[in-house]
UniProtKB/Swiss-Prot annotation:
Phosphoserine carried by residues: 64
Entry PTM: Ubiquitinated.
Keyword annotations of the record: Cytoplasm, Glycogen biosynthesis, Glycosidase, Glycosyltransferase, Hydrolase, Multifunctional enzyme, Phosphoprotein, Transferase, Ubl conjugation
Location within or outside the cell: Cytoplasm
Family: Belongs to the glycogen debranching enzyme family.
Any Pfam family hit: GDE_C
InterPro entries in the cross-refs: 6-hairpin_glycosidase_sf (IPR008928), AGL/Gdb1 (IPR010401), AGL_central (IPR032788), AGL_euk_N (IPR029436), AGL_glucanoTrfase (IPR032792), GDE_C (IPR032790), Glycogen_debranch_met (IPR006421), Glycoside_hydrolase_SF (IPR017853)
GO cellular component, one term: cytoplasm
Cross-referenced Gene3D superfamilies: Glycosidases (3.20.20.80)
Tissue: Ubiquitous. Expressed in striated skeletal muscle, heart, liver, spleen, skin, spinal cord, lung, kidney and testicle.
E.C. code: 2.4.1.25, 3.2.1.33
The protein's name: Glycogen debranching enzyme
Catalytic activity: Transfers a segment of a (1->4)-alpha-D-glucan to a new position in an acceptor, which may be glucose or a (1->4)-alpha-D-glucan; Hydrolysis of (1->6)-alpha-D-glucosidic branch linkages in glycogen phosphorylase limit dextrin
Length: 1533
């Protein structure tokens, strides 16, 4: 948490294409690309077009990024490549896996806007924009006096509609010349230029602190643009787009119909020039179907000339030398090939297919005639289909046309155009026609004359519900034919093609236009962005950003889908999307939009500086009204202007409005027809003055106040937002600063209905505002005044003079005219709430309060922030140092906690329910939800890690914190009740919590999290500092796995290990709380949580020693490892180490492998630990010096460890045979009587250790049947008697090691001496070692050669090239089962294996057994395989009931570690290429463990999963040996 640089990480996943995901970043951020689990280990290269420092951006130029590995380790969990973002715009990245593109996306970096003489930064959230229709500003020398209104109103950005020469329609967006300044702005004696505009823009920026942006219009140009007639190829005309010919013919026919209707020619048929009702509309429909369509034969453009085609076909049939076509391709049917020139009956068919389809049975004329008739019939059918299709298009065309007529002439909300005339035709024309009138037939002849047809150009417009990524004028679209275009008859649609070479003039012209704009303005608004070809906009914006690197790009998108919006935002690098408050139907929806478009919830969690890059929604420019919107005074009421604009300006994003709104202009200011000028600023003007305005006009005075407030809130970090819908009309919006905990609360009473004609209640609900109201920032009411009523002025765009606002700023609460009474209510001891009773909060009123925490809470927050600065500089602002705090807080937390041992950290961080219950406690339970997994801090952190990134303040965990102090007290009291440093940590937390309890409840989750995450990360660092350098310098994955050691190794209230010899001087001791006497407190390893964590079921010999190397030796916890080895050595009996330890006194000696795992651990200890061989001479207190002695207390009989080792070896060669003590249901309620007979020994011929019988299960696969219903009770599922492969491997490892030590005289024995048939015999370690070596592969390997004479049971072999699971089992077929156990032997005794054979077996295991996390415990091809473990199921199925298949398929994790380590070892012997592939496999498998570890609330790896990695509810959630063997694999890497 310490560093303050903002870093975001983006995880790359295989085949993940994120083109529709918006990632927003700021300049100065670092972006790190990291490998997701699917890519770890693979050769991945990331490419981006983000330029190298000092280079200019080129969208097409990609370069690769270098990988950095902070730990220099082989695992990929921390590997990243990075970008330091210093440039605004849209940048693409993609990544290759080898040479194949595997995924990618875009990032958008926000521009930095600067303003003022000092060039200070204007944050995007501070923008307050106003739109001006430039043509209404008048002559250029009068602009300043009109723009001053925006300055005085507090706006800091002006959006000008296009400043270029306008087309004939005078629409602001139909430009006749993109490069020329509109001549209307010049005077007869003074011509103004772009240079003058640039100077004004610069003055506004420097002197007025106002930035200027303007539109760029790329889609169309005015129909009278001179250059489009010089370069007709720039438009969609009938030469370059012949597919539009049928639509053009229809368009002309409709124009002639319109002229005829205007002249009264259809009056008799029911259609006069003035269309007034539905009957006339139906008559139009009838006329079109009966008079128009039959005349123009549109279908002919899509049909074949039947006569011509048949004659051509006949000619081909009768050709002497026509090539005989064999059987036609059945997929190829005869179909019409569209004539690319779209001539009538100009379509064709493929004659080859025709000849292959219609074959005459001989060459006679009758056969040929018959064939031609069939061909004719098929062509007629195909033509009929086209006719039908055109009919379908014509049906849609009539419907669209009538919809248009209805809107323009009949609809209440339409323009009501009046009679049909040439100026206002029946429908807008879709194409230009720059020629004299002529007859339809003469007109049609023009479409085939290129020099004429090129001037018949398609108009632009928009299509309702169309896909914005599809160009509706391109071939394949029928929009013009179906009349689906809502057409702008003054503009021609521009045809760019795919690249500049496709239309060089147009691209160059528009690029120049863009460059003029970017030279003089700080930003652009992309007009009609959703129908601008995206590649064109990209090209133009790239040119603009070359001149204006921090270009502010705004756009309006009407795609109807956030995914589609994101494609435009990400590819174009749009800075802000325009959002309209006018889209809200009521105040409730308006409030929802405020919450949607910006800010985080009040009381949000503090996010770390390094965090995942999360998908964003586009930054909003939230406008109370845009220049396209209809007038809100008409739609709502004049009284709503003030409250709605206040609600909008309280949003935590950019905000904006349009000139005329503040003056209360009661009609829409039309971008097409408005020719009057805006008002000028004059402080002295009277309300009746129509040409001038000041603070007495409209809502200008209030607008200035809310604009200034909007800018302050954005600049000062009031980033948290809360919206409260007080009642149907009142919306309260809170903006809160998370650093100084001040709030600004606006209460707006909207007036969507006119208060003069609608009822509004006098009763306004009381409001409760938490904290202390410092001042009323603003109170304003919309009122009427006595002056002349509104009359539309002829020269100026004037507003309503009779409505204004009464405002008061920065007053005390008691001076307010809107608040009647403010009382103080306290909710609980630290909640300071003010109750507000309103009077005069009339519709159209707003009041804004500035609220601080009550002084007591403010101090408490300040002190908390002061103490939190030790964890993060984020808390510096708003912090407060005091002298009278608890003395413990004067000590940094790290120095208090640094004294904690790892065993104490186990108590502070972990302890599951059953461990905690031993101490009389338990895990914290959140009512109506669940209990925490751990009583320690990890239990809380697991939940906070889920809810913090999502800011899920509604989670039951947060509810519990807000509702009371129970959880807070639990955390500190649990620790204080213990002794020593743990209690000190508890006291530090308690002192912090004292202040936490004094702050408002809504802030408690955020600060509770901040305290805990600071403490938690410090504690983790303290843990790692006590571990080996492998951990300290390891990757995040290694570090998080190593915490499994802290999780599993601890000391309970009652020590689980037998006492060690008192003559050991470095044992840990503690004072017993009850007896007050000193007692040993050695840590023991739990086998797994939560099932094997406390009491006699905590410690198991086999689990302990499989886990010990990974959890204690690799992590550097040598003392704990030694103590556990010696404690178990003390319990040796019958030459065996117990499985269930039961503190030694309740031990069960029913396993054959624990002793060999114990010996392997002693060997590992000697090799890993400095001076590790010293352990061989350490005293072992024997609990059972003889097989039958009673348990002796520590120190009674001590002997060095090497003697105990020799005894274990001796007893095995001698042969072990005994019956378990207390045999029967009291120690095992399922075992059959014979199962309690234990045997083990060493085969004289082979040297293999063997043992067991078919009624017991002495290896790790130890499931005993327990179902009476399925009749498997007392039968082991996997007895594995005989010589189990991993035990043979482990014994070989032990024998080889002891041989080496004896040769160096470190181990005093060279042999074992045993009694056989009454005589003493010696077996040397050398001989024993050789026997295993000579026999292992011969007897365990299943040869790929079926005639191998070593094979005793060739009939049982069903997989070749593997190693048997056992040798000499009582059921011979069990030997031949494929299981993962042979990989253990490969790791501990690789010398037993021929590398090539080992590799083959490993490949089979990988293919058949390797799952996502674990290894299948049985070959899935085996008839008893079942991969789903359900211990609760009791049915008749012998193989499944009561979890009988525990080791018959489910995927266990710990063998995966051995499999991967074996692969790594043997891959090195198989050559560099194999080794590289294996490294990938290992990293890839481990990455899945990493993902599981990070996501697991237990922060561990499970015992097993069901097949294919599915969750198994019966598994331990975190298992010692699972974590250990994965950690060992990373150690081997």
């Amino acid at each position: 948490m310490g560093h303050s640089k903002q870093i975001r990480t983006l995880l790359l996943n295989e085949m993940e294409k994120l083109e529709k995901t918006l990632f927003r970043l700021e300049q100065g951020f670092e972006l790190q690309f990291r490998l997701g689990p699917t890519l770890q280990g693979k050769a991945v290269t990331v490419y981006t077009n983000y330029p190298f420092p000092g280079e200019t951006f080129n969208r097409e130029k990609f370069h690769s990024l270098q990988w950095e590995n902070p730990t220099e380790r082989e695992d990929d969990s921390d590997k990243y490549c990075k970008l330091n973002l210093q440039q605004a715009g849209s940048f693409q990245y993609y990544f290759l896996q080898g040479n194949e593109k595997s995924g990618g996306g875009y990032i958008v970096v926000d521009p930095i806007l600067r303003v003022g003489a000092d060039n200070h930064v204007l944050p995007l959230d501070c923008v307050t924009l106003q739109t001006f229709l430039t043509k209404c500003l008048g002559p250029f020398d009068e602009w300043e006096s009109r723009l001053r209104v925006a300055k005085e109103s507090g706006y800091n950005m002006i959006h000008f509609t296009p400043l270029q020469t306008l087309g004939l329609s005078r629409s602001s967006y139909s430009l006749a010349d993109q490069l020329e300044l509109n001549p209307d702005f010049s005077r007869p004696n003074k011509k103004y230029t772009w240079h003058d505009v640039g100077q004004l823009v610069e003055k506004l920026k420097k002197e007025w602190d106002i930035l200027c942006i303007t539109d760029v219009v790329y889609n169309h140009t005015a129909a009278n643009s001179k250059w489009i007639h010089e370069h007709p190829e720039s438009a969609y005309n009938l030469v370059n787009s012949p597919h539009l010919k049928p639509a053009w013919v229809l368009d002309r026919a409709l124009w002639h119909l319109s002229c005829d209707v205007a002249e009264g020619k259809y009056r008799e048929k029911g259609v006069p020039a003035l269309i007034e009702n539905d009957h006339q509309m139906n008559c139009i429909r009838k006329i079109i179907w009966e008079d128009i369509y039959p005349k123009i034969h549109l279908w002919e453009f899509f049909q074949v000339d039947v006569h011509k085609a048949v004659e051509q076909f006949r000619g081909l049939l009768t050709q002497e030398n026509r090539k005989i076509i064999s059987q036609p391709d059945p997929k190829q049917h005869l179909k019409i090939i569209q004539d690319p020139e779209y001539r009538r009956l100009g379509c064709t068919v493929d004659m080859n297919i025709a000849l292959a389809t219609f074959i005459p049975h001989d060459n006679g004329p009758a056969a040929i005639d018959e064939c031609c008739n069939w061909f004719r019939k098929r062509i007629e059918e195909l033509n009929a289909e086209k006719h039908q299709l055109v009919n379908y298009h014509q049906e849609q065309a009539v419907n669209c046309l009538l919809g248009n007529v209805f809107y323009e002439r009949l609809a209440g909300h339409g323009p009501k155009l009046g009679p049909v005339t040439r100026k206002h035709p029946l429908v807008t024309r879709y194409f230009t026609f720059p020629f004299e009138e002529m007859t339809p037939s003469t007109e049609e002849s023009m479409i085939h004359l290129p020099n004429k047809a090129c001037f018949l150009m398609a108009h632009n417009g928009w299509v309702m519900g169309d896909d914005p990524l599809r160009n509706f004028a391109e071939p394949g679209s029928d929009v013009y034919l179906r009349r689906e275009l809502i057409c702008w008859g003054d503009s021609v649609k521009l045809r760019y093609g795919n690249k500049p070479e496709d239309c060089p003039y147009l691209w160059a012209h528009m690029k120049k236009y863009t460059e003029i704009t970017a030279t003089h303005f700080q930003g652009v608004r992309l007009d009609n962005c959703h129908s601008t070809p995206i590649h064109v906009a990209e090209y133009m914006l790239d040119a603009a950003r070359k001149l204006q690197p921090n270009l502010y790009v705004v756009a309006e998108l009407f795609t109807g889908s956030e995914d589609l919006d994101n494609i435009f935002v990400t590819r174009l690098g749009i800075s802000s999307l325009i959002r309209e408050a006018m889209s809200a139907a009521d105040s409730h929806e308006e409030g929802r939009l405020v919450y949607r478009y910006g800010g985080e919830p009040v009381g949000s969690f503090v996010q770390p500086c390094l965090r995942p890059l999360m998908p964003a929604i586009a930054h909003a420019l939230f406008m109370d009204i845009t220049h396209d919107n209809e007038c809100p005074i008409v739609h709502r009421s004049a009284y709503d202007a003030l409250p709605s604009s206040t609600i909008v300006s309280m949003a935590s994003c950019a905000s904006g409005s349009t000139k005329g709104y503040d003056e209360l202009v009661p009609h829409q200011i039309s971008v097409v027809s408005e020719e009057r000028f805006y008002t000028k600023w004059n402080p002295e003007a009277l309300p009746s003055n129509t040409g001038e305005v000041n603070f007495q006009s409209g809502i200008i005075a209030a607008r200035r106040a809310i604009n200034k407030l909007h800018q302050e809130l954005g600049a000062k970090g009031f980033i948290q937002v809360y919206v409260d819908q007080v009642d149907q009309d009142i919306v309260a919006v809170t903006r809160h600063s998370p650093s100084i905990h001040q709030s600004v609360v606006s209460v707006s009473r909207t007036a969507f209905r006119n208060p003069k004609t609608s009822f509004y209640s006098k009763e306004v609900p009381h409001m409760y505002i938490p904290g202390k109201i410092e001042e009323v920032v603003l109170e304003a009411r919309t009122i009427e005044r006595h002056t002349i009523p509104y009359k539309k002025d002829e020269n100026s765009i004037n507003g309503m003079p009779d409505i204004t606002v009464e405002i008061r700023e920065h007053i005390q609460l008691n001076e307010s005219k809107i608040v009647k009474h403010a009382g103080i209510v306290t909710k609980g001891p630290n909640e300071f709430v003010q109750e507000i009773e309103f009077e005069n909060l009339t519709p159209g009123s707003v009041i804004i309060f500035r609220v601080s925490l009550d002084p007591h809470a403010q101090v408490a927050v300040g002190i908390l922030r002061n103490h939190l600065t030790q964890f993060s500089p984020h808390f510096k602002s708003g912090s407060l140092a005091v002298d009278n705090a608890d003395p413990i807080l004067k000590i940094p937390f790290a120095s208090i906690a640094s004294k904690l041992t790892l065993a104490e950290l186990n108590q502070v961080l972990y302890r599951c329910e059953s461990e905690e219950q031993e101490d009389g406690g338990g895990c914290y339970n959140i009512p109506n939800w669940s209990s925490l997994k751990y009583a320690g801090l990890q239990g809380l952190m697991s939940i906070l890690a889920e809810i913090r990134p999502r800011n899920d303040l509604g989670h039951p965990f947060c509810d519990n914190l807000r509702s009371g102090d129970w959880m807070i007290d639990y955390v500190s009291s649990r620790l204080i009740s213990r002794s020593g440093t743990i209690a000190e940590v508890g006291k530090w937390l308690q002192a912090m919590f004292l202040y936490l309890k004094q702050i408002p409840r809504y802030l408690i989750p955020c600060y509770f999290d901040a305290i805990l995450i600071g403490a938690y990360t410090t504690l983790l660092d303290i843990a790692w500092k006590q571990m080996s350098s492998f951990v300290q310098n390891g990757s995040t994955f290694v570090k998080h796995l190593s915490l499994g050691s802290v999780q599993m190794c601890g000391v309970g209230k009652f020590p689980s290990l037998p006492l060690l010899s008192p003559s050991l001087t470095d044992l840990p001791y503690r004072v017993n709380e009850i007896t007050k006497e000193k007692e040993q407190c050695c840590g023991s390893l739990a086998a797994g949580l939560p099932h094997f964590s406390a009491g006699i079921f905590r410690c198991w010999g086999r689990d302990t020693f499989i886990a010990l190397r990974g959890l204690l030796l690799v992590t550097g916890r040598y003392l704990e490892a030694r103590n556990i080895i010696l404690a178990f050595a003390g319990t040796l009996r019958h030459g065996l180490i117990p499985n269930l330890l039961g503190e030694g006194t309740h031990a069960r000696y029913n396993c054959r492998d624990a002793v060999w795992w114990w010996l392997q651990c002693i060997q590992d200890y000697c090799k890993i630990v400095p001076n590790g061989l010293d352990i061989l001479r350490c005293p072992v207190s024997r609990m059972y010096p003889t097989d039958d002695s009673v348990p002796l207390s520590a120190g009674t009989v001590d002997q060095p460890l090497f003697e105990v080792i020799q005894e274990a070896m001796q007893r095995h060669v001698q042969g072990i045979q005994f019956r378990e003590r207390n045999a029967g249901p009291q120690i095992d309620r399922n075992m059959k009587d014979e199962g309690f007979n234990i045997t083990a020994g060493v085969d004289e011929e082979t040297g293999f250790v063997y043992g067991g019988n078919r009624f017991n299960c002495g290896t790790w696969m130890d499931k005993m049947g327990e179902s009476d219903r399925a009749r498997n009770r007392g039968i082991p599922a996997t007895p594995r008697d005989g010589s189990a492969v991993e035990i043979v491997g482990l014994s070989k490892s032990a024998v080889r090691w002891l041989l080496e030590l004896s040769r160096k005289n470190i181990f005093p024995y060279h042999e074992v001496r045993v009694k056989r048939h009454g005589k003493f015999v010696t077996v040397s370690y050398d001989e024993w070692n050789r026997k295993i070596q000579d026999n292992f592969e011969k007897l365990f390997h299943v040869s790929e050669d079926p005639s191998d004479f070593n094979e005793k049971h060739p009939e049982l072999v069903h997989k070749r090239g593997i190693y048997k699971d056992s040798y000499g089992a009582s059921s011979p077929w069990c030997d031949y089962q494929l299981r993962p156990n042979f990989t253990i032997a490969m790791v501990v005794a690789p010398e037993l294996f021929t590398p090539e054979k080992a590799w083959k077996a490993l490949e089979i295991a990988e293919k058949k057994l390797l799952g996502p996390l674990g290894m299948k415990t049985l070959d899935p091809d085996d008839m008893v395989y079942c991969g789903i473990y359900d211990n609760a199921l009791d049915n008749d199925n012998y193989n499944l009931a009561k979890g009988f298949n525990y080791h018959q398929g489910p995927e266990w994790l710990w063998p995966t570690g051995y499999f991967l380590r074996a692969k790594l070892y043997f891959s090195k012997l198989m050559g560099p290429e194999t080794n590289a592939k294996t490294m990938f496999l290992v990293k890839n498998v481990l990455s899945r463990h990493y993902v599981h570890l990070e996501r697991s609330p237990w922060k561990g790896l499970p015992e097993l999963t069901n097949e294919n990695g599915q969750y198994c509810p019966f598994s331990c959630e975190t298992q010692a040996w699972s974590i250990a063997t994965v950690l060992e694999t990373l150690y081997d890497l």
